[in-house]
Amino acid sequence: MTIQSRLGKSDTRPRFILRVIIVSNLINAKDLEFLLYDVFQAEQLTELSFYQDHDKTTFDGVIATSAKIATDYFLPHNAKADSNEPQFDGESVTTIPEVKEAWQHYSQSGLLAARHRYNDGGMQLPAIIHTACVSYFMSANPSTSGYPFLTSAAANLINAFASDEHKKKYLPAMFDGRFSGTMAMTEPDVGS
C-alpha cells in the first residue's frame, strides 16, 4: 500500500524520501515521513511568512542531523547513564563523560534554539519539525535528553516572561550550550 493509496488521493509532489537519508533504527522514518507530510502536512507551513525560508529539504536535513547525533552520541551510553546517576559532592555535579560529549554535539547543532526566531539566534523551526527531532533523542537516551530539553524549556520561559536584560544575559549562553537550565517545581502538599 502506498502513501497515496492510504490517503485515497494521488500525490504528485516530488518526494525526498526521509528514510533514505536517515540511518537510524530509533524511529521508523517511513512512518515519521507519512505523519509529518501526509497526515499533518507540515510542508504547508512554509507558505506562512514566518517559515518561508524553509522547505521540505531543510526540514528533512534537520531531522536527519538529529537522528545522526542521537544515534552516534546519545544511544551508545543509554544504559551507562541509567546505571551511573549524576553525583553531587556538595559543590558540583559529576556525570559520566559521555553526557558532556552528547551535550556538546547537541548544542553545536543549533537545536537548543531551533524553535526560536532568527533575531533571537534560532532557526524559526516549526514546532512539529522540532518535535520530530526531539523524538530521536528521547528514543536514544531519555536520561541524557533531559539536559538539553530542560534547558530549552527554561529558555522558552525566559524568552516569554523575562526582562530584556535577562534575555540578553541568559538566552545566548543557553542557546549555544555555555549555560544549561532546569525547572524546579515544588509540590508542598506532598512534602517537597
Regions found by a protein language model. Give the residues of each.
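Residues marking the start of alpha-helices
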Residues: 121, 157-158
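Phosphate/diphosphate-binding loops
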Residues: 155, 161-192
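Amphipathic, small/basic residue-rich leader segments at the start of a protein or domain
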Residues: 13-146, 165, 169, 180
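Cysteine-centered functional microenvironments
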Residues: 114-118, 151, 184-189
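Contiguous, well-ordered alpha-helical segments that form the cores/surfaces of helical PPI scaffolds
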Residues: 131-135, 152-157, 183
